[in-house]
Regions:
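Short, solvent-exposed turn/loop segments enriched in Gly/Ser/Thr/Pro and often Arg
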Residues: 1-8, 27-31
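A conserved helix-loop-beta module that forms one wall/lid of the active-site cleft
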Residues: 15-78, 85, 262
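ATP-dependent carboxylate activation and anion-phosphoryl transfer catalytic cores
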Residues: 4, 8, 15, 19, ...
Length: 358
């Protein structure tokens, strides 16, 4: 919905009817929303991508390329997202089932069942770069967000800056994100997503041609109102900042508060205080139904250091009360208090282990 959604067909309808769409052009949404097309474009301009294939005709072709890439690998839908249309395959015997399942799932969810193969990288982090691009050709990068803490390929907690990012890797990844935006003729707000390997190598995985759920943590450390700039850029206002003007200050964390059940919110207490806020539409007596995304809101904290931000988030989670609907607040507390998180030594597969340990 709104700024958090992307639909090339809707953007095109706006263009055809003289309505200014706040976002990139429809053809850019189409191109970058297709993982195969965007992957090929990145290869052409020299942005590193994960080893993989183009769209595959059938299972037999997939088996042939799988032998070249090596197992484990991913079967990915070109139109996939949010964990849909993606399967991990550890051996050839499972490839056919994964191929058909991912294709059917993507066809049902996105109307496009095309799939391709990609090497499955282990012990990686999911790091994304926030960009703003105006209609005059200026592009800014507002730094990274570490979104590695995921359950079922759904983000649970995000932080910025990434606790493992060096200045050298950050600069290279920012340059790659700007290069990706230029190659796509991108305008407005967007996010370029990468996998970061333990050896410091990073690989483009996709570009989100919209505002991300987790954008507020970037706003906190950069002082840039991303949504305001989305509207200004759509009105052809040029960016009034240069890259060297962007000063990233402090550390910000976002915890997604999700419903674990349906029901009526009988009591609600939202934490307050300086540099703490809860983005939500939730109110007392709100009825949570099963038809939509389970996220109830985003708890965001900002502090001078990562350690202080962790303490502030822990206190805020302890203060938050939602009665009548089961939530993941206790799981978020468990995560924030874990030694693995506090050391910053985590990857995309670690959350299951943290929650199982208790």
């Amino acid at each position: 919905y709104g700024f958090l959604s992307e639909n090339a067909g809707f953007a095109k309808l706006c263009e055809e009817n003289g309505i200014v769409f706040i976002g990139p052009k429809s053809e850019v949404i189409s191109a970058m929303g297709d993982k195969d097309t965007s992957r090929q474009l990145m290869q052409q301009v020299g942005v590193p991508v994960v080893p993989g294939t183009e769209v595959l005709k059938d299972v037999e072709e997939a088996k042939k390329y799988a032998k070249e890439i090596g197992y484990p690998l991913l079967v990915k839908a070109t139109a996939g997202g949010g964990g849909k249309g993606i399967r991990v395959v550890a051996r050839e015997e499972d490839l056919a089932d994964a191929f058909h399942t991912a294709s059917r799932e993507a066809e049902s969810a996105f109307g496009n069942g095309d799939v391709f193969l990609e090497k499955y990288l282990t012990h990686v982090r999911h790091v994304e770069m926030q960009i703003l691009a105006d209609q005059q050709g200026n592009i800014l990068c507002l730094g990274e967000r570490d979104c590695s803490l995921q359950l079922n390929k759904q983000k649970v907690l995000e932080e910025t800056p990434s606790p493992v990012m060096t200045e050298d890797i950050r600069r290279k990844m920012m340059d790659a994100a700007v290069l990706a935006a230029k190659a796509a003729n991108y305008t407005n707000a967007g996010t370029v997503e990468f996998l970061l390997a333990p050896d410091g190598q990073f690989y483009f995985i996709e570009m989100n041609t919209r505002l991300q759920v987790e954008h507020p943590i970037t706003e906190e450390i950069s002082g840039v109102d991303i949504v305001k700039w989305q509207i200004r850029i759509a009105c052809q206002v040029p960016l009034n900042m240069k890259q060297e003007d962007i000063r990233l200050q402090g550390h910000a964390i976002e915890c997604r508060i999700n419903a674990r059940s349906t029901g009526r919110v009988e009591f609600l207490h939202i934490p307050g205080g300086g540099r703490v806020h809860f983005d939500t539409a939730l109110m007392q007596d709100t009825v949570v139904v099963p038809f939509y995304d389970s996220m109830l809101g985003k708890l965001i904290v900002h502090a001078n250091t990562r350690e202080e931000a962790i303490r502030r988030m822990e206190a805020s989670l302890c203060e938050m009360v939602i009665v009548g609907v089961e939530t993941n607040i206790e799981e978020q507390l468990q995560l924030i208090r874990s030694k693995i998180f506090q050391k910053g030594n985590y990857d995309t597969l670690i959350l299951d282990k943290i929650l199982k340990k208790g």
